[in-house]
């Protein structure tokens, strides 16, 4: 099983822009075009393509944001805008990619926690995150989405 997490570059940008979620997920996540524009405006975001067996199957953004809290004086590591392309959904790739992303972020940032935010009615995604140990912490992000955190 070959899983790769690759930065968005000129070489894969067109393919990244061609990734889409299914129709019923459109209200939960921005398009990759908007995501890449946001990453240009906020240098903390690191947009990546998610590859399985050489095929581009998904997208995510992550980063270390300088939010101070007692246990994480250097900031918070956030996983954001994670999705699997509609053509690859229903094949277990969400689980595989989330596991790989958690491991990648833990190694890259040497962090104690990973944060994400989610719409409270995105039940399928909430269940996935809960299976991987993410729990609601009672916070809301600046968009009013509920914050989940995973202790590493």
UniProtKB/Swiss-Prot annotation:
The keyword Metal-binding does not apply. Pathway: Amine and polyamine degradation; spermine degradation. Induction: Expression is strongly induced by spermine, but not by agmatine, putrescine or spermidine. Transmembrane segments: none annotated. Pfam families: Acetyltransf_1. Belongs to the acetyltransferase family. Probably acetylates spermine to N(1)-acetylspermine. This is Probable spermine N(1)-acetyltransferase. It comes from Bacillus subtilis subsp. natto (strain BEST195).
């Amino acid at each position: 099983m070959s899983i790769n997490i690759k930065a968005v570059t000129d070489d894969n940008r067109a393919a990244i822009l061609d990734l889409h979620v299914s129709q019923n997920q459109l209200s939960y996540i921005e398009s990759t075009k908007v995501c890449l524009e946001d990453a240009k405006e906020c240098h903390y975001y690191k947009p990546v393509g998610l590859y399985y067996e050489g095929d581009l199957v998904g997208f995510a953004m992550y980063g270390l944001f300088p939010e101070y809290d007692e246990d994480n004086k250097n900031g918070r590591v956030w996983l954001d805008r994670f999705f699997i392309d509609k053509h690859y959904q229903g094949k277990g790739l969400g689980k595989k990619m989330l596991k790989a992303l958690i491991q990648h972020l833990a190694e890259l940032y040497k962090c104690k926690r990973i944060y994400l935010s989610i719409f409270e009615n995105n039940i399928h995604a909430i269940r996935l995150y809960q299976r991987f140990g993410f729990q609601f912490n009672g916070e809301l992000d600046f968009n009013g989405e509920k914050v989940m955190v995973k202790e590493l």
